[in-house]
């Protein structure tokens, strides 16, 4: 039996399916490429405020606005951001990946992978880290989204954990481990710990 090849949508296909099984809002046709679309970075980041992150507990964080003049990211820090765009996909698998132009500056995106699910809707949370200080700006074109056809039955996204997200989403791993959203972390002098680090 001949297998059906899994195919990536071209930029033209992406545009022709907008409003049907693909939603990208806002959409700018100038950001289409031959087989992807460039998504942009919103104007805010999130950083954790725990010296040790606990997978079984919600971890405290603070928000960092990205000013128009830019924000310098530092090595050794995990930054969470999100896309400006809200996307919705039906019957296709969306995948995002960092742009090579930023990788060549030492800025890397989502090392854990960015495989979406058919039926996902919301903004995308982005995991950013750099190998040397790098300055970023609000609404830069941060990543590319591609759409892949699915072979076989494709049930819509059933998980509500990150579905319908309109904000940066920190890890919710603690829910998978059976813990609730109560803050069980000890108070830590995060700024003092950073200042005292040799």
UniProtKB/Swiss-Prot annotation:
An individual GO BP term: dUTP biosynthetic process
Superkingdom of origin: Bacteria
Keyword vocabulary terms for this entry: Hydrolase, Nucleotide metabolism, Nucleotide-binding
GO MF annotation list: dCTP deaminase activity; nucleotide binding
Protein name: dCTP deaminase
Keyword Zinc: no
Enzyme Commission identifier(s): 3.5.4.13
CDD domains linked to this entry: trimeric_dUTPase
Coiled coil stretches, renumbered: none
Root EC class: hydrolase
Family the UniProt entry places it in: Belongs to the dCTP deaminase family.
Reactions performed catalytically: dCTP + H2O + H(+) = dUTP + NH4(+)
InterPro entries named in the record: dCTP_deaminase, dUTPase-like_sf, dUTPase_trimeric
Annotated source species: Rhodopirellula baltica (strain DSM 10527 / NCIMB 13988 / SH1)
Catalytic residues (positions): 127 (proton donor/acceptor)
Gene from which this protein is expressed: dcd
Keyword Hydrolase: yes
Record-linked HAMAP family: dCTP_deaminase
Metabolic or biological pathway: Pyrimidine metabolism; dUMP biosynthesis; dUMP from dCTP (dUTP route): step 1/2
Ligand binding (dCTP): 99-104, 125-127, 144
């Amino acid at each position: 039996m001949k297998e059906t090849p899994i195919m990536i949508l071209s930029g033209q296909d992406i545009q022709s399916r907008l409003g049907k099984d693909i939603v990208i809002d806002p959409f700018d046709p100038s950001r289409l490429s031959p087989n992807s679309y460039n998504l942009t970075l919103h104007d805010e980041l999130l950083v954790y405020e725990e010296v040790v992150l606990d997978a079984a507990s919600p971890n405290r964080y603070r928000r960092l606005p990205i000013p128009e003049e830019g924000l310098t990211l530092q090595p050794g820090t995990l930054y969470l951001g999100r896309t400006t765009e809200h996307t919705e996909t039906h019957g296709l698998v969306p995948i995002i990946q960092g742009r090579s132009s930023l990788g060549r500056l030492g800025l890397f995106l989502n090392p854990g992978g960015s495989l979406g699910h058919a039926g996902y809707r919301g903004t995308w949370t982005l995991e950013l880290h750099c190998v040397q200080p790098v300055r970023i700006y609000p609404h830069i074109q941060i990543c590319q989204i591609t759409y892949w056809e699915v072979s076989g039955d494709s049930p819509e996204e059933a998980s509500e954990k990150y579905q319908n997200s309109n904000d940066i989403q920190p890890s919710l791993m603690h829910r998978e481990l059976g813990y609730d959203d109560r803050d069980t972390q000890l108070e830590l002098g995060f700024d003092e710990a950073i200042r005292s680090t040799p």
